């Protein structure tokens, strides 16, 4: 599914339009609310589609530039969806508790990741085998905890170019850290959330798994397109670089012939 082919009916069937109870609404979501039904706000899906297109195009450009997009979803109903699709894209993701300072104290987080790598080296170089049973158990537990919380960002060597969160209110710490560093924030925002708290707000039901699946799957397709563009550009650049030495060598081979003619 691409930006220009968003099917409103599919969004409707996925329950993307269901908001929260009217008494829990955030006034700044008013432009995205279509109506009230049985005490629940109904989101305008045409506006959802427009915001999906806007966010998708921006994420595509970020992916095409070679920068990473970190996906954040610690809510139970979003974890599996996000981890699966982010893994397919080769993008970092956080689906367990957000580690405080994940972005604002990235150097320390990187040290924790390096600790995980150090433990792995201990197992391969034989050091691990020299430890006592108790020490081995402690190290194994440390490794498991690090893998659970930071395993998906092990390959991150620098801050992401953007973050995407399933629920801006639920992931407010991640959103706050990103803002402090000027990192763009993409987010699904329900009717109880301030849409101006993020850079790219997608008004949608952020509680139902089908709704989350529909939005994240669309963004996945956009990012994959961006990655394909980058790969194509790189292949073209490599091809030109390979041709350059040949083009430079050709005149040099013809030079002796010119000298022979002069003689």
Predicted regions and their residues:
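Intrinsically disordered, compositionally biased charged tails
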Residues: 1-5, 225-263
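Structural motif
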Residues: 70, 164-165, 186
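Compositionally biased, low-hydrophobicity segments enriched in charged and small polar residues
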Residues: 187-193, 262-263
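Acidic-enriched and Gly/Ser
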Residues: 2-147, 153, 157, 171, ...
């Amino acid at each position: 599914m691409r930006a220009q082919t968003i099917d409103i009916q599919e969004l409707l069937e996925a329950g993307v339009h269901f908001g929260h109870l009217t008494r829990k609404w955030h006034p700044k979501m008013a432009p995205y609310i279509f109506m009230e039904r049985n005490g629940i706000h109904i989101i305008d899906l045409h506006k959802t589609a427009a915001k999906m297109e806007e966010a998708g195009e921006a994420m595509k450009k970020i992916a095409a530039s070679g920068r990473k997009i970190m996906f954040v979803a610690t809510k139970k109903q979003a974890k599996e969806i996000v981890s699966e699709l982010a893994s397919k894209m080769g993008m970092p993701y956080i689906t367990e508790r957000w580690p405080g300072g994940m972005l604002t104290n990235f150097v320390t987080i990187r040290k924790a990741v390096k600790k995980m790598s150090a433990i792995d080296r201990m197992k391969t170089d034989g050091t691990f085998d020299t430890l006592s049973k108790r020490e081995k158990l402690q190290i194994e537990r440390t490794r498991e905890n690090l893998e659970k919380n930071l395993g998906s960002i092990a390959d991150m060597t620098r801050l992401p170019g953007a973050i995407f969160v399933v629920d801006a209110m639920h992931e407010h710490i991640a959103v706050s850290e990103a803002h402090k560093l000027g990192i763009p924030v993409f987010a699904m925002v329900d009717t109880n959330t301030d849409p101006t708290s993020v850079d790219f707000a997608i008004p949608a039901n952020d509680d139902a798994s089908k709704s989350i699946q529909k939005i994240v799957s669309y963004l996945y397709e956009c990012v994959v397109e961006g990655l394909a563009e980058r790969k194509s550009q790189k292949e073209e650049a490599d091809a030109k670089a390979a041709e350059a030495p040949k083009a430079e060598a050709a005149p040099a081979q013809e030079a002796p012939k010119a000298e022979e003619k002069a003689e």
